[in-house]
Swiss-Prot record:
Entry keyword annotation includes DNA-binding: no
Domain PUA: 94-170
Family in the record: Belongs to the NIP7 family.
Name assigned to this protein: 60S ribosome subunit biogenesis protein NIP7 homolog
Subcellular location: Nucleus, Nucleolus
Organism whose genome encodes this protein: Dictyostelium discoideum
GO biological process annotation, one example: ribosomal large subunit biogenesis
Pfam families linked: pre-PUA_NIP7 (PF17833), UPF0113 (PF03657)
Keyword Nucleus: yes
Quaternary data: Monomer. Interacts with pre-ribosome complex. May bind to RNA.
InterPro entries assigned to the protein according to its UniProt record, in alphabetical order: NIP7_N, Nip7_N_euk, PUA, PUA-like_sf, PUA_sf, Ribosomal_synth_fac_NIP7, UPF0113_PUA
Length: 179
């Protein structure tokens, strides 16, 4: 595992800031113990520094995963968040969307969220903003990007698109062989 380059860090943190805002600093400057981000085979991992030091004896070829995978860099250099980071996104999310029970399964099958399935949305959520989706019982079920602001959502018809799908907990089953 290696530290990220400056360009990789810039791309990664821009994507992360879109979802959790300035709370990114809370991920790195934790009170319990220091954590860091490391790259292994184009995947970014969030790992404690103590665990990182202990893993230095393991050869790169033998190391599959270490810590929590936040996502991966594509061949074009873009960063794609992975569903495995949902716990951290949900904990520090700036903007949240709650999904009605009737639309939860549709979301978990990889579909976008329509206005008819929107339970609640954080006030003053802008358009094209990263959001974390929750069930009405406050269980995180995925993340996406809003298509409209909170103010615009109130005036939409029930079949209008509200949140573009980006990741959901159903990916654990659909993509279990590549995770």
């Amino acid at each position: 595992m290696r530290p990220m380059t400056e360009e990789e860090s810039k791309t990664f943190f821009e994507k992360l800031i879109k979802f959790i805002g300035k709370n990114v600093t809370l991920l790195i400057q934790r009170k319990d113990e220091p954590y860091c981000f490391r790259i292994q085979k184009n995947k970014v991992y969030y790992v404690s520094e103590e665990l990182m030091k202990r893993s230095q004896n393991i050869p790169r070829e033998g190391l599959c995963s270490l810590g929590t995978c936040f996502g991966r860099f594509t061949k074009t250099g873009k960063f794609k968040l992975n569903i495995t980071c949902l716990d951290y996104l949900a904990q520090y999310a700036k903007y949240k969307v709650w999904v009605k029970p009737s639309s939860e399964m549709s979301w978990m099958y990889g579909n976008n969220l329509l206005k008819a399935g929107l339970g609640r949305i954080t006030e003053d959520t802008p358009a094209n903003q990263g959001v974390v989706l929750f069930s009405m019982n406050d269980v995180p079920i995925g993340f996406g990007v809003t298509s409209k602001s909170t103010h615009e959502c109130r005036k939409l018809d029930p079949q209008a698109l509200v949140v573009y799908h980006y990741g959901d907990v159903g990916e654990y089953l659909r993509d279990e062989d590549i995770m």
